[in-house]
Amino acid sequence: LRCSGDGNKYDNPPFAINNVNSRDAIYNKGISTSALQYGNIRQYDAHNLYGITESIVTNTVQEELANKRSFVLSRSTFPGSGAHVAHWTGDNAATWNDLRWSVPTILKFGLFGIPMVGADICGFSGASNMELCARWTALGSFYPFARNHNNLEAPSQETYVWPEVTTVGQKFIGMRYRLLPYIYTLGYHAHVEGFPIARPLFMEFPTDTATYGINYQFMLGNALLVTPVVNQGATSVTGYYPAGVWYNIFDYSKISSTGRPVTTTVTLYDLPVHIRGGTILAMHQTALTSTAARLTPFDILVALPASGNADGDLYLDDGEMISNPSATIVKFTASAGTFTSTVEKNDYAGAHSSLVNKVIVLGVTSSPSSVSLGSISKYDSATQRLEISLSSVKQTIDTDFTITWK
């Protein structure tokens, strides 16, 4: 059914749909948007209702049957879908162009109110290759929803297919498992406040006009700046670093920026990820499953700014209770010489046995001689990193504590 013609405002609206870069007609692979449905409703107005209403029903029924949270993944979404389902960006291809496009696509869906979103890592259609899959695995480890997925006709592209990609996966997927407490906390804030998990830089730095045109870097929450390598054969990557102090999350090297581009040399096994000075996040130890990771002790990473304070938070629950879950909420603050962890809510029983392994403080300019709790396990003057071990004091995450050093 087609009711075409330049005068048909429903089939030929004054905008284009950028679908896989093809800018197809709005009715492509569907019935005419000028067609009338039951109730005298135009397809133009009703087309997107199918996906969102199916999402609502599927999510509701699954939760009623299991009496716990469901996880529904949908490609057909609409504003409001984010309260019910996750989204993936559709049938991409194993190309460098689609790797690049994945970043702004994911960021836009976060702004649409669909925070749990990701692209098919390594590409859905076509044959991926070692370099592309290595770069995509590193990048995809920081998607809100991370999944390597391709069609049945395409060659296998699991991380074990290429030894190099296996090494990349161990590093970056391993880091994702470490960051799950932080990512889960971002999911909590997305749920109750509407903040995207993956954010364009301009959202965190709205007065910095240099961030407005950045398409391929992104913030994971307010704390982590991800600078993907998106070009084939690249041996360096240039990213913009807003004013402040930024610490590499892998080797703790520091960038002090007034708001400028920085070029970093990269091997196949590198992707710059920096924690923002002034933020604090909680991490687990790496593991093979999220269930196993949740049973490991916490490390708390404190990134001190050049001057002033740092803060962060942690949200914990059982991951399954649907409404009014029993939760523990912890607030972290730090300044020069002091770190404080304050429990604001303490209803999740699982937090009672969750130990804090160590507190890592970045930006400590001189070696301290003593700490008020635990012991100094390391001070590295090159990275200005202080590590305070709490393993001997059996400090749990659900009780207040303060550490001072001098």
Language-model-detected regions and their locations in the chain:
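Intrinsic disorder/low-complexity detector
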Residues: 8-14, 20-21, 30, 169, ...
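Generic beta-strand structural signal
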Residues: 219-220, 241, 334, 379-381
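Solvent-exposed beta-strand/loop surfaces of large extracellular or lumenal domains
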Residues: 249-268, 370-391
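Accessory, solvent-exposed terminal regions and/or long lumenal/extracellular loops of proteins
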Residues: 273-374, 385, 390-398, 405-406
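Polar/charged alpha-helical tracts
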Residues: 198, 253, 335-336, 381-383, ...
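Catalytic-domain carbohydrate-binding cleft regions of carbohydrate-active enzymes
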Residues: 1-276
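Intrinsic disorder/low-structure terminal segments
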Residues: 9, 14, 70, 142-144, ...
